[in-house]
From Swiss-Prot:
GO terms for biological process: DNA replication, removal of RNA primer; mismatch repair. Manganese or magnesium. Binds 1 divalent metal ion per monomer in the absence of substrate. May bind a second metal ion after substrate binding. The lineage of its organism: Bacteria, Pseudomonadati, Pseudomonadota, Alphaproteobacteria, Hyphomicrobiales. The keyword Transferase does not apply. The keyword Cytoplasm applies. GO terms for cellular component: cytoplasm; ribonuclease H2 complex. This is Ribonuclease HII.
Length: 231
């Protein structure tokens, strides 16, 4: 009788599945080209904008190692960001904390993705959108793909561009609002960030429609010395 293979056997050591060009190829076969991938970064933080990117990759110059930005190190993201910006058509848009508060985080995210796709210097004929929802008012056909940043290389590239751009914006915001440590946590609800909010109250970058701010609307805002350049 043969013995069952152990899960530690090399036969069970499968390579991780990386995003590929399948969705883009299907769209091209259906007569839609070029194809853009779109994704956002920063839906969950308590502070800062949500940033969206749209990317049209050159099929002959797709950077190696593209993946969901959350699965990459900061160093890997920075290196891929540089390569994407050098070889692809890229557009970036953002929705501020005030925009998020005036609408909601989903609407603000979808609006940023729409503006990013609209802003491409080469018009996309099809857009692959990360998530369950397609932004309204797009200038092209589109398809929403759940976990698209781990399935489509174009969406993966957009996720990297959005993440690196937002992290850089929050690092610059740290100079204007040094008490909050934005360069360390990018506005996410870390212990340090929550402690700073408890000590100093919210600032103008905080999303007042998010908890815990709904119960602290009366606290004074920190004063910005000027606008924060998103680039």
């Amino acid at each position: 009788m043969s013995r069952r293979k152990s899960p530690d056997s090399p036969l069970f050591q499968l390579e991780p599945v990386l995003p590929d060009f399948s969705f883009e190829i299907t769209a091209k076969r259906d007569g839609f080209w070029p194809v853009a991938g779109a994704d956002e970064a920063g839906r969950g933080p308590l502070a800062g904008p949500v940033v969206a990117a749209a990317v049209i990759l050159d099929p002959d110059a797709v950077p190696g190692g593209l993946n969901d930005s959350k699965l990459l190190t900061a160093e890997q993201r920075e290196a891929l960001f540089t390569e994407i910006m050098a070889t692809a058509t890229v557009s970036i848009a953002s929705s501020s904390a005030a925009h998020i508060d005036a609408t909601d985080i989903l609407k603000a995210s979808l609006d940023a993705m729409r503006r990013a796709i609209d802003g491409l210097s080469i018009a996309a004929r099809f857009a692959l959108i990360d998530g369950r929802d397609v932004p309204q008012g797009l200038p092209c056909h589109a398809k929403a793909i759940v976990k698209g940043d781990s399935r489509s290389v174009s969406i993966a590239a957009a996720s990297i561009v959005a993440k690196v751009t937002r992290d850089r914006m929050m690092a610059r915001a740290d100079a204007t609002f040094p008490a909050y440590g934005f360069a360390l946590h990018a506005g996410y609800a870390t212990v340090r960030h929550r402690s700073a909010i408890d000590s100093h109250g919210p600032c103008s970058l905080h999303r007042m429609s998010f908890r815990p701010f709904r119960e602290a609307q009366e606290q004074p805002l920190a004063v910005s010395t000027g606008p924060i350049d998103p680039n």
